[in-house]
A protein has these predicted regions:
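Short hydrophobic/aromatic patches on beta-strands that form ligand-binding or substrate-lining surfaces
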Residues: 84-87, 99-101, 151-160, 168, ...
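Extracellular glycan-recognition modules
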Residues: 96, 100-102, 129-190, 267-274, ...
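Bacterial Sec-dependent N-terminal signal peptides
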Residues: 2, 10, 14-55
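Flexible glycan-contacting loops in extracellular carbohydrate-active proteins
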Residues: 234-259, 284-289
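Extended recognition patches within non-cytosolic domains
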Residues: 96-99, 261-305
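Extracellular glycan-interaction surfaces
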Residues: 107-131, 152-162, 179-241
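Glycan-binding loop/region signatures in secreted carbohydrate-active enzymes
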Residues: 41, 52, 79-81, 95-97, ...
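Chitinase-like catalytic core of GlcNAc-active glycosidases
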Residues: 52-107, 111-115, 255, 301-436
């Protein structure tokens, strides 16, 4: 079924690239029309005279890292695009950036050291009570809101039980944000969230042996998992419904005497699922926010699951794909509305975006801030766009993604970007039709967005029209047995979904090609 989806996906992407630098033509039989490519394979074609007004037709796509890791996005489908946006970053109100998978490479201090092996496990972290490991401030907080659930898991060998020794903690200006510590007696553990502490005792947890230990936190309910036992032990004590949303360093191993191995943080409830070495080919594991394997003697604190590692994997998947393409940083969500409303934050944001682009050799950035509705918000968003262009310079590719309900940025902002993508879809099924597609594009052009700068978005998913009820085209094909290339509605899991069929996307692409738009997304 996956091969069927890939075939359909490549068929669609092939159509999208068909009109690059030319007028759309359909030539099933007969003589090719004037202007089409003719000749035999291997014949030399006379080059056209360069046209300074010629623009490459944009075939753009977002990449979500979790979809890529679970093989929902192939190298071939990415290779069919000439512009790829890796959607991974989010801004804080002060203009700082965070990522869906932060780079949590940890620094070892004191006597925290790499050990090649210990008591049957290879590549481990050794702690003697005087050292610790600091993974920076990227974990258990978010510009999208406080964490209400997570799992922390690790293999641990306790050489000597020390009351208060930390498996991990976050402390801000002397106040505990969150801490997971050994308790007063062997087998006793305590979890502190803010000013509240809950405790648990499990006699299976003993010093002098390796154990898998995981704590899950779900809206204030904490559970402990030990070794292979899938039955959790509940913590006793009342905890708040979320972790204080404070940016503070994530520190492991302070005062701990023993060893750690295969330590991870996940945003879901994993229980014993992290007990084996983690691979990232299933949905739950893609939500692993940090993974320290301690198997690199030169960099024992290396985080093995980051957005930057995903970026390199995307680049590797594109090896051998024909043609040139841009890979750009996608920035969405977070506290963007607060950020654009503050001049100092806008400056910080622009400088941070530039730094990331340069550090990771990216081709530019895309802003997908949903949505500015008021005149003030649109004006502030426009200022952020203009300032970002000023900081990036003219040679870095910059775009914004807008929506038919929110596209009226300033003329200066329109001039500052290389193109504007218009998301002609949404939770409402009314946005999916060909007629609405045309009218939304016309409205944006009438407002003042140049037609050749407007990249029109099409949906590769279906919706029932109810918020939260969307299904990816991948699933409609793979699980819903969608085979009809003309069906704009389909029954899936007992509900009717509105989508764009292959034929509808073909028609929209043909319309974009024939009417001078900048591209398709």
């Amino acid at each position: 079924m996956r091969s069927k989806f890939l075939f359909l996906c490549l068929f669609l992407f092939g159509m999208l690239t068909a009109c690059k630098n030319t007028k759309w033509v359909d030539v099933p039989t007969g003589t090719p029309p004037e202007g089409s490519v003719t000749g035999k394979p291997g014949e030399t074609e006379e080059p056209d005279d360069p046209d300074p007004t010629d623009k490459t037709f944009i075939n753009c796509s977002y990449i979500r890292g979790d979809f890529f890791e679970t093989n929902r996005i192939s190298g071939a489908s990415m290779g069919a695009c000439n512009d790829l946006i890796y959607l991974t970053a989010r801004p804080y109100a002060d203009g700082d950036l965070t990522f869906d998978l932060p780079v949590n490479d940890a620094t070892l201090t004191g006597a925290a050291t790499y050990a090649a092996s210990y008591n049957g496990r290879n590549g481990v972290l050794k702690l003697d009570g005087t050292g610790k490991m600091n993974a920076g401030d990227g974990l258990l907080h978010s510009p999208d809101g406080a964490f209400k659930k997570f799992t922390f898991g690790t293999y641990i060998y306790v050489s000597e039980w020390v009351d208060g020794a930390c498996l991990f903690k976050k402390v801000d200006d002397g106040s505990v944000v969150i801490a997971f510590q050994l308790g007063a007696t062997e087998g006793n553990l305590k979890l502190t969230v803010g000013s509240a502490t809950a405790t648990v005792t499990n006699s299976a947890l003993k010093s002098g042996a390796w154990h898998y230990v995981a704590v899950t936190y779900d809206g204030g309910a904490a559970k402990l998992y030990i070794d292979t036992n899938n039955t959790a032990t509940d913590f006793t004590g009342s905890l708040p419904a979320s972790v204080p949303n404070t940016r503070a360093d994530f520190v492991m191993g302070e005062n701990l005497k023993g060893y750690l191995d295969e330590t991870f943080v996940n945003s879901l409830l994993m229980g014993t699922l992290g007990r084996n070495p983690i691979s990232f080919d299933n949905w739950n594991n893609t939500k692993t926010l940090a993974y320290w394997k301690y198997d690199d003697a030169a960099k024992p604190g290396k985080d093995s699951h980051t957005w930057a590692i995903r970026l390199e994997q995307i680049r590797t998947a594109l090896n051998g794909q024909a043609g040139d393409r841009k890979i750009r940083l996608g920035i969405a969500g977070g506290e963007w509305l607060k950020m654009v409303g503050n001049a100092t934050a806008r400056t910080n944001f622009a400088n941070n975006v530039k730094k990331v682009i340069e550090q990771y050799n990216l081709d530019g950035a895309d802003l997908d801030f949903e949505w500015a509705y008021s005149g003030t918000d649109l004006a502030n968003y426009s200022k952020a766009i203009v300032q970002l262009r000023e900081v990036l310079g003219k040679d870095v590719f910059l775009t914004v993604s807008l929506h038919p309900v929110s596209y009226k940025i300033s003329a200066e902002a329109i001039a500052a970007v290389d193109f504007i993508s218009l998301q002609c879809y949404g939770p409402s099924v009314k946005l999916f039709s060909m007629e609405r597609f045309k009218s939304d594009g016309k409205a944006a052009v009438d407002y003042g967005i140049p037609q050749d700068k407007l990249v029109m978005g099409v949906p590769f998913y279906g919706t029932t029209g109810t918020a939260g009820e969307q299904a990816a085209y991948f699933d409609l094909v793979g699980k819903g047995n969608l085979t009809n290339t003309s069906a704009d509605t389909w029954s899936y899991e007992g509900k009717n979904y509105t989508l764009n069929s292959q034929n509808t996307i073909r028609q929209k692409t043909q319309y974009v090609c024939e009417n001078g738009f900048g591209g398709i997304m």
